[in-house]
Every structure is written in C-alpha cells, then in structure tokens.
C-alpha cells in the first residue's frame, strides 16, 4: 500500500512538471526581459482644464523612449517612471502624428533595458501567433497581458489638420487587452 502511494506521488510529481506549457514559459521569459525597458509616461495638461494623461513607453536606446504621439500630444512637464519606481524628466525629440509615434529623450537616466525592433515585413507575421503587451494600464503596473496577432492590414488614420490628409499604414491588430494607460506599450512576440 505504501509503495503504491509513493508511486502515485512520484507520478503526480513527474506529470505536474509538464503542466506548464512551453508557450507559457516563453511568455514569462519575454515579460521578464521587457520589464526593465518599459516605462510609465506622464505629464501635466498643456491648457488649464485639460486632462493629465498617463501612458506607456519603452527604451529603444540608452536615453530614448518610444511612445504613442497621442499620449504626449497635449502634455507638458513630461516624466517617465521606470519599473523600479525612479522618475526622470523627459522631452520630445521627434514626433510623427500620422503614425502616432513620439520619440522622447530621458534626462539623467540610463536605460535599464532596451527593446529592439525586428526587421520583419508585417504581412509575413502569422495570424494567431502569441503576443505579449507590457504597460501601465490606468497608470498602474507595470502589468502584462497576452493574446494573439489577430490581423495585419492597412488602417487610414485621419490627421488633426485636414489639409494634410490621412496617412495609411500597415497596422498590427491584437486581441490582447488594451486599456487606458497601455497606449505606447510594446507588442512583443514570444521570441521577444
């Protein structure tokens, strides 16, 4: 009876180790690698009565952070908060409202982690592949969510100035939960 119980426990131990799928391990590794590079972006409203906005960004160089343009569009006194809680002043370096991107320079900080862009044609990305999002939803976090790449295609983005027209680009669509504050988050595949 004791031998049977011991065998059952050993079997449960061996089988229990297989309960974590390789995709879950890869997802956890990608999140851990991304965390040091992801920052909370915030500032105060440019105009009285305007909204203070919180978003996300990520280091792409030693002192350069990428975020969405709409996160910083109406803000002044920009700051970024690192995952470890330290806060640094930031300033606009370059913006492209048409593709909703902004590059910030962070003063006095050296990136604790950097994320790089892969040179892959969007149309070659397989629909259904696992993706991870790391950001600051509602200013909290950093928090991670995951989903799949659910689509790749053009999206016409109207620009604030109608005389400029609209810019059409190739966009990635995901079913990973996106909430207020996640704008500017990196969308990562399971290889990072």
Regions found by a protein language model. Give the residues of each.
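Short, acidic/polar N-cap/turn motifs at the starts of alpha helices
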Residues: 28, 38, 77-78, 184
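Proteins with a high burden of low-complexity, intrinsically disordered sequence enriched in S/T/G/P/A and R
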Residues: 14, 28, 76-77, 192
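Active-site region of chymotrypsin-like
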Residues: 34-48, 106-118, 143-191
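N-terminal targeting leaders that route proteins to membranes or the secretory/organellar pathways
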Residues: 1-38, 42-45, 50-52
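Alpha-helix initiation/capping motif
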Residues: 20-23, 27, 138, 167, ...
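Conserved active-site neighborhood of the chymotrypsin/trypsin-like protease fold
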Residues: 19-21, 47-54, 59-143, 171, ...
């Amino acid at each position: 009876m004791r031998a049977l119980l011991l065998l059952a426990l050993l079997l449960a131990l061996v089988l229990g180790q297989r309960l974590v799928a390789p995709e879950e391990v890869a997802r956890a590794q990608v999140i851990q690698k991304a965390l040091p590079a992801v920052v909370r972006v915030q500032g105060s409203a440019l105009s009285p009565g305007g909204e203070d906005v919180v978003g996300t960004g990520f280091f792409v160089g030693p002192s350069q952070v990428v975020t969405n343009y709409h996160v910083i569009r109406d803000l002044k006194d920009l700051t970024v908060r690192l995952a470890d809680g330290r806060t640094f002043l930031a300033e606009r370096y370059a913006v492209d409202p048409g593709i909703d991107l902004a590059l910030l320079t962070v003063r006095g900080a050296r990136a604790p982690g950097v994320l790089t862009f892969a040179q892959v044609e969007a149309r070659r990305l397989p629909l259904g592949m696992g993706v991870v999002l790391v950001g600051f939803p509602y200013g909290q976090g950093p928090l991670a969510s995951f989903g799949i790449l659910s689509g790749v295609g053009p999206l016409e983005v109207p620009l604030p100035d109608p005389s400029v027209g609209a810019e059409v680009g190739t966009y990635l669509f995901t079913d990973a939960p996106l909430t207020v504050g996640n704008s500017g988050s990196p969308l990562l595949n399971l290889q990072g």
